[in-house]
Amino acid sequence: MRCTSPAALVTFCAGLWISNHVLAQGLEAGVRSRADCEVCKEFLNRFYNSLLTRGIDFSVDTIEEELISFCADTKGKENRLCYYLGATKDSATKILGEVTRPMSVHMPTVKICEKLKKMDSQICELKYEKKLDLESVDLWKMRVAELKQILHSWGEECRACAEKHDYVNLIKELAPKYVETRPQTEL
């Protein structure tokens, strides 16, 4: 590409800078594709924001202690992420320093997850399970095994359930407790 004037070159460079800046803001604001490292990015963003709101000191030791306690309440894929990071008691490896050091200097969580991916690709292979919309799905058309899976994902169990309608009724009864009702934000 050949620029004929300095003004054209400045305009071109400014356009590149703005497009990269907007893309970076979009990645941080949640307008990103959820394909790569979704559990890592979501979890570390939530953890980082909880540290900010509580006014926690951003020292490496403090962040490590907070991460271990934050991981104590996790379930599912997030618990698996904590296991890979070494923040659970049964973890085989401990790579917490790869999270705490960059976070202590306020490195974006996207960059932290990219570094973790280079160390252990399993971290970025974690994906959240699809959320079940109980208002749109017909529970009566689901298999009993699928209904049991819904209860299991909620941490519930039905020992007295003998037939399908027992499971369906229990899910409908417990749904208000477990189904998130977030207001839809317009983009």
Curated annotation (Swiss-Prot):
Keyword Methyltransferase attached: no
Annotated signal peptide: 1-24
A GO CC term attached to the entry: endoplasmic reticulum
UniProt-listed InterPro entries: ARMET-like, ARMET_C, ARMET_N, SAP_dom_sf
Entry annotated with the keyword Secreted: yes
GO BP annotation list: dopaminergic neuron differentiation; neuron projection development
Localization terms from the record: Secreted
Entry-linked Pfam families: ARMET_C, ARMET_N
Domain of life from the UniProt record: Eukaryota
Primary location: secreted
Disulphide bridges, residue numbers: C37-C124, C40-C113, C71-C82
Family: Belongs to the ARMET family.
PANTHER family xrefs: ARMET-LIKE PROTEIN, CEREBRAL DOPAMINE NEUROTROPHIC FACTOR
UniProt protein name: Cerebral dopamine neurotrophic factor
Annotated organism of origin: Rattus norvegicus (Rat)
Gene: Cdnf
